[in-house]
């Protein structure tokens, strides 16, 4: 009798590593792992994740590149709306999860999977984003969530993997790191309380730049179009290059405290150098190019758009209506912004209108 197929949304982190081993060893499924890359991983990292999947027992692994789609359908509008949840968080993981879920469920349908699985816990928002998207787009495919259903701790998962012969840097696995084009979130024991901060070592990007630097960002109709005079047709490449330029200053680090979709408080650390610089520069440019009423209504609509995106409502038709408004608002948002980079901070210096 053929084994049941399950497609697992796989990042290579602790929770999904546990899920591969558990679903194959304990449940007897053929596990097909898939990573939906939103631009946070380079080719070397993707290769390492693939090797990890096979080492854990996956029968097949797929890398789904959705970076350009993610930019065109989400990041662009988050910039247009200057979206920072609670004035702090650039909705890094929140926004990419929906597109990852769409890619994963489409892959599951493509290979004829019986089930789809993810490694989300029962405490956060990702479980809702995955479940809701899966249920809307493929209600006939069952959903398996081992980490949530068994209320597992990270310590338990580490011990389980050790007992089953899987070796890794388990010290590093003590932190849940979600890396994407629009920022990286970091969760660990410190984020479970309100009076602790993440250690420097928990951040993937370390502060190595000590000399201040002045850079310029160019925008055309609201979109990032140039860095230091270099023009970019590929907006994803512009974001990646700006991240490489600014991340060594440890810019864009913060702790976000917010209300989860399920109604409890959540706390997470993040680093997002490029997103924070782009949003700040874009907003400064808009002050010169939009009327006060355009700015006012865009602030209201942008807040709603960010809230809906955060709460797994991307597929709600009103989101397309809001995007049409945001597109219209950017017709005159063209110019250059000068920024000074310093360790742990930045200063907006000047905005030049083209």
Give residue ranges: language-model regions.
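Nucleotide-activated chemistry modules centered on ATP-dependent adenylation/adenylyltransferase
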Residues: 2-353
């Amino acid at each position: 009798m053929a084994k049941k197929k399950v497609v697992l949304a796989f990042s290579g982190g602790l929770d999904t590593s546990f899920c591969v081993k558990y679903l194959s060893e304990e449940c007897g499924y053929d596990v097909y792992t898939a990573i939906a890359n939103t631009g946070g991983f380079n080719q070397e990292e993707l290769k390492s994740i693939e090797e990890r999947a096979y080492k854990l027992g996956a029968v097949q692994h797929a890398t789904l590149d959705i970076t350009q789609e993610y930019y065109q359908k989400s990041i662009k509008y988050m910039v247009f709306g200057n979206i920072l949840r609670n004035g702090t968080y650039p909705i890094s993981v929140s926004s990419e999860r929906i597109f990852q879920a769409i890619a994963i469920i489409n892959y599951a349908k493509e290979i004829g999977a019986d089930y789809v699985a993810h490694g989300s816990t029962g405490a956060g928002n990702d479980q809702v984003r995955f479940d809701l998207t899966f249920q809307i787009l493929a209600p006939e495919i069952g959903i398996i969530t081992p980490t949530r259903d068994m209320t597992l701790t990270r310590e338990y998962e580490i011990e389980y993997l050790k007992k089953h012969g899987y070796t890794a840097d388990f010290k590093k696995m003590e932190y849940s790191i979600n890396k994407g084009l629009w920022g990286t979130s970091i969760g660990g024991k410190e984020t479970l309380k309100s009076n602790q901060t993440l250690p420097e070592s928990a951040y993937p990007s370390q502060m190595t730049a000590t000399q201040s630097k002045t850079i310029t960002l160019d925008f055309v109709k609201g979109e990032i179009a140039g860095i230091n005079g270099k023009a970019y047709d590929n907006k994803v490449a512009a974001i990646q290059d700006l991240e490489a330029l600014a991340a060594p200053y440890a810019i864009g680090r913060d702790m976000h405290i917010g209300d989860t979709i399920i109604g409890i408080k959540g706390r997470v650390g993040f680093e997002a150098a490029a997103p924070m610089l782009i949003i700040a520069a874009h907003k400064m440019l808009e002050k010169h190019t939009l009327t006060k009423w355009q700015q006012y209504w865009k602030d209201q609509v942008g807040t709603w758009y960010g809230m809906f995106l955060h709460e797994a409502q991307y597929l709600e038709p009103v989101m397309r209506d809001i995007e049409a408004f945001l597109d219209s608002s950017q017709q005159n948002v063209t110019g250059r912004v000068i920024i000074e980079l310093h360790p742990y901070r930045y200063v907006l210096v000047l905005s030049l209108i083209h």
